[in-house]
C-alpha cells in the first residue's frame, strides 16, 4: 500500500503526526510542483443526472425541522475511523446525514448538512463539503485524503447540487454560516458524530451567549431523537431500496448454499460461508449491512457469533444472519437456519417448526387492526412458551411463564422479536418508546420478525437431544398503505420442505 508525507527529501519528519507516514518521501521542489500541476487533459464528463432520491429530500428536511422553527440544525456526515495507524475503515456516513443528503456509498466524509431556517418558515437543507480542486494545486497529488491522484475523481459543488437538488457550499464556509445571526438563531448539533464539527458549533454557541457543551445536551438530544423518529415510516424510494437489498441478500444466501459442501471439512468452514455471502454483498451492493453471523452447531446459541472461525459439520444446523447494504445504504436483515447436509433431523425439525410457528403467529398479529409494535413480540412468545411446555422443558405452565413475574421461557429466547429496519440494521434506535415499542403499526414501517430457540450444549435444564441446537428465522416485513403487513422477503424459502428443496436445487441435486 502506498504512503504519503508532507516533508521534502532532505527533511526528516519531526512530529509524531508526521511520522505516521514516514516510510516514503516526496519531492517538494518548485520544479516538481510546476511540472505536476501542468499538462493534464480535460476531465471526462461525469454524466451527472438528478438522482431518484432527490425528489424526496425536501419533505425529509421539512419533517426533520418541524419541531425546531427558526433554529439552525447541524447534522454531520462523520469522518474516517482509524483501523490501525494510517489505515482507516471504509467511510460510512451517519445515517441521518445520508437520509437528508441522499448520498450513499462512501460519500462524503467530513461533510455537513445544515438545515437553515427560512424567513417564511421551514428549513432549507444546505450541504457543505470539500469539492475537488484544480489539478494545478498541491492538494491534487499530495493530499491522500482528498487529492484526486490518491482517491479518484471528486465532484464539484455544481455536480452534487445537480445530483441532489440541494444547495451546496464549500466546507470552508461552514463556520461563518453557523455564526450568522447566532444568538438570535439557536443552534443544535448531532453529538458524537464529528468532534470537529461539534467543537465548532459549541464555539459559536459560546461566543453568541448560547448554552453549549453539556448545558446544550438536552437541546441536541432532541434533534437526534427527531432525526430517528422521522425514519420510522419509509417513503416509496426507501421501500424500493429495502426490497432491492432483500433481493440481493437472497442471491447471497444462494451462494451460501452452494458453498456448504466446501465448508464441510474446512477447519474454518464458517468463514467459507461468510466469504460466499460477503462476495455477493460487495459485488452487487455497497457491502455488508452488518457483520455476518455464520454459526454452525452450538455456535448458533451465541446470539452475535461473528468470529465465524469454527468448522461446519455434516449433520449440524448452521444459522446465518446476514444482510446486504445497497449503494443507498439501506440494508436487509435476514436469518435462515440451514441443515448442512440438506435434511433436518427429527429433533432439528421439531425445534425449527416451533420457531416457524412463532413467526407465523407474529405476522398474523401484525395484520390485526390496532396492533402495537410490542404486540408482535408477545404473539411470538405465546407460541414459544406453548411449545416449551409441550416438550416438558418449562418448570412452570406456559401461562405462568408468560406473566411478568415468570418469563422462564426467555431462557431459550432471550432477545426481542422485532426491530425497525432501514439505513441502520437496528433503525430508529433513538426514537422515544411511545414512538417505537408502544406505537401502533403504520403504513411505511419496515421491521423484522425474528424469533428463535437456543439450546446451549451445556444446558442441563433440557434433555440431551435438544442440546447444541440453535434456530432463528428472520424475515423483513412492511406495513402496506392498506394496513396489511407482508414479508418483503417472501421469496426466500423458510418452511422445512422449501428449505430442503432450496438447498438441493442450489447444489444441483434437485
Question: Could you say what each language-model-derived stretch is?
Answer:
Residues 1-510:
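Active-site neighborhoods and metal-handling regions in enzymes and metal-associated proteins
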Amino acid at each position: 500500500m502506498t504512503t504519503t508525507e508532507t516533508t521534502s527529501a532532505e527533511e526528516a519528519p519531526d512530529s509524531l503526526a508526521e511520522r505516521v507516514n514516514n516510510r516514503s518521501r516526496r519531492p517538494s521542489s518548485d520544479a516538481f510542483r510546476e511540472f505536476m500541476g501542468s499538462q493534464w487533459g480535460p476531465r471526462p464528463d461525469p454524466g451527472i443526472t438528478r438522482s431518484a432520491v432527490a425528489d424526496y429530500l425536501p419533505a425529509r428536511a421539512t419533517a426533520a425541522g418541524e419541531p425546531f422553527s427558526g433554529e439552525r440544525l447541524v447534522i454531520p456526515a462523520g469522518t474516517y475511523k482509524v483501523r490501525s495507524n494510517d489505515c482507516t475503515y471504509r467511510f460510512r456516513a451517519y445515517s441521518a446525514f445520508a437520509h437528508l443528503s441522499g448520498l450513499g456509498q462512501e460519500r462524503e466524509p467530513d461533510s455537513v448538512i445544515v438545515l437553515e431556517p427560512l424567513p417564511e418558515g421551514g428549513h432549507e437543507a444546505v450541504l457543505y463539503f470539500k469539492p475537488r480542486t484544480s489539478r494545478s494545486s498541491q492538494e491534487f497529488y499530495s493530499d491522500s485524503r482528498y487529492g484526486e491522484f490518491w482517491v479518484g475523481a471528486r465532484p464539484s459543488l455544481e455536480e452534487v447540487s445537480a445530483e441532489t437538488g440541494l444547495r451546496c457550499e464549500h466546507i470552508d464556509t461552514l463556520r461563518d454560516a453557523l455564526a450568522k445571526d447566532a444568538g438570535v438563531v439557536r443552534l443544535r448539533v448531532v453529538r458524537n458524530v464529528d468532534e470537529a464539527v461539534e467543537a465548532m458549533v459549541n464555539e459559536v454557541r459560546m461566543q453568541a451567549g448560547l448554552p453549549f457543551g453539556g448545558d446544550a445536551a438536552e437541546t441536541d438530544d432532541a434533534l437526534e431523537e427527531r432525526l430517528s423518529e422521522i425514519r420510522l415510516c419509509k417513503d416509496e424510494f426507501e421501500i424500493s431500496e429495502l426490497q432491492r437489498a432483500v433481493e440481493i441478500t437472497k442471491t447471497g444466501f444462494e451462494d451460501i448454499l452452494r458453498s456448504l459442501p466446501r465448508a464441510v471439512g474446512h477447519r474454518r468452514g464458517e468463514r467459507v460461508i461468510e466469504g460466499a455471502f460477503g462476495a455477493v454483498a460487495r459485488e452487487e451492493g455497497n457491502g455488508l449491512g452488518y457483520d455476518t453471523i455464520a454459526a454452525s452447531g452450538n455456535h448458533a446459541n451465541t446470539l452475535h457469533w461473528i468470529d465465524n472461525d469454527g468448522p461446519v459439520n455434516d449433520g449440524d444446523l448452521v444459522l446465518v444472519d446476514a444482510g446486504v447494504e445497497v449503494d443507498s445504504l439501506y440494508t436487509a436483515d435476514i436469518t435462515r437456519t440451514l441443515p448442512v447436509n440438506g435434511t433436518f433431523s427429527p429433533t432439528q425439525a421439531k425445534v425449527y417448526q416451533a420457531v416457524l410457528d412463532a413467526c407465523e403467529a407474529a405476522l398474523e398479529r401484525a395484520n390485526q387492526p390496532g396492533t402495537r409494535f410490542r404486540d408482535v413480540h408477545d404473539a411470538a412468545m405465546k407460541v414459544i412458551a406453548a411449545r416449551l411446555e409441550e416438550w416438558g422443558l418449562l418448570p412452570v405452565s406456559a401461562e405462568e411463564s408468560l406473566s411478568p413475574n415468570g418469563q422462564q421461557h426467555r431462557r431459550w429466547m432471550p432477545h426481542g422479536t422485532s426491530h425497525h429496519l432501514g439505513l441502520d440494521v437496528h433503525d430508529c434506535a433513538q426514537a422515544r418508546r411511545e414512538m417505537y415499542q408502544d406505537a401502533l403499526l403504520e403504513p411505511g414501517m419496515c421491521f423484522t420478525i425474528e424469533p428463535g430457540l437456543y439450546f446451549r450444549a451445556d444446558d442441563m435444564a433440557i434433555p440431551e437431544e435438544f442440546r447444541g441446537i440453535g434456530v432463528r428465522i428472520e424475515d423483513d416485513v412492511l406495513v402496506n398503505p392498506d394496513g396489511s403487513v407482508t414479508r418483503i422477503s417472501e421469496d426466500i424459502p423458510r418452511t422445512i420442505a422449501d428449505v430442503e428443496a432450496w438447498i438441493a436445487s442450489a447444489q444441483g441435486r434437485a
